[in-house]
């Protein structure tokens, strides 16, 4: 199978690298393409963009890099459409990944899996609707989030 993974930080790189190793153990022909990091690269596959080129923290840095952020998003969407993976796996990083999920759901027939679901705080309640609409499978490491997503209750 062809797997497209997207992470945006070091912790996502760590968790995704473990997931990739587990997938490879079950699917020796696994072909990975990703926005990720060094740990994912060590497992194998093609890195499209390093997460260090994606992550901006704080209002001002995000504002200053909006053009780069949108260019990375456009590149990611185009790469997914061009490569046609069997599945897209998103790892945390909701600001970027929820937009990618929406695009993939609307423009392709590729299933979207969310590994390590986004944190659903009271002020991000709308994420529950977006996840239900755009994500085919949700895998959470915090059981609290799975029950919240199931009943539309915000996690506080």
Task: For each feature predicted by the language model, list its residue ranges.
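A short beta-strand/loop micro-motif in the catalytic core of glycosyltransferases
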Residues: 89, 135-142
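Conserved small/polar residues in nucleotide/adenosyl-binding loops
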Residues: 145-152
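A conserved, positively charged/aromatic
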Residues: 122-136
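N-terminal subdomain of nucleotide-sugar transferases
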Residues: 1-39
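Conserved nucleotide-sugar phosphate-binding/catalytic loop shared by glycosyltransferases and other
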Residues: 5-7, 33-79
């Amino acid at each position: 199978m062809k797997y497209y993974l997207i992470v945006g930080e070091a912790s996502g790189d760590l968790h995704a690298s473990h997931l990739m190793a587990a997938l490879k153990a079950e699917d020796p022909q696994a072909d990975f393409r990703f926005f990720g990091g060094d740990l994912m690269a060590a497992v194998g596959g093609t890195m499209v963009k390093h997460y260090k080129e994606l992550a901006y923290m704080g209002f001002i840095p995000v504002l200053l890099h909006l053009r780069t952020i949108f260019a990375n998003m456009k590149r990611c969407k185009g790469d997914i459409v061009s490569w046609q993976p069997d599945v897209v796996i998103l790892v945390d990083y909701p600001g970027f990944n929820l937009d990618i999920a929406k695009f993939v759901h609307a423009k392709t027939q590729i299933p979207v899996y969310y590994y390590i679901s986004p944190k659903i705080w009271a002020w991000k309640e709308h994420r529950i609707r977006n996840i239900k609409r755009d994500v085919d499978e949700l895998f959470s490491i915090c059981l609290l989030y799975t029950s919240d997503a199931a009943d539309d209750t915000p996690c506080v």
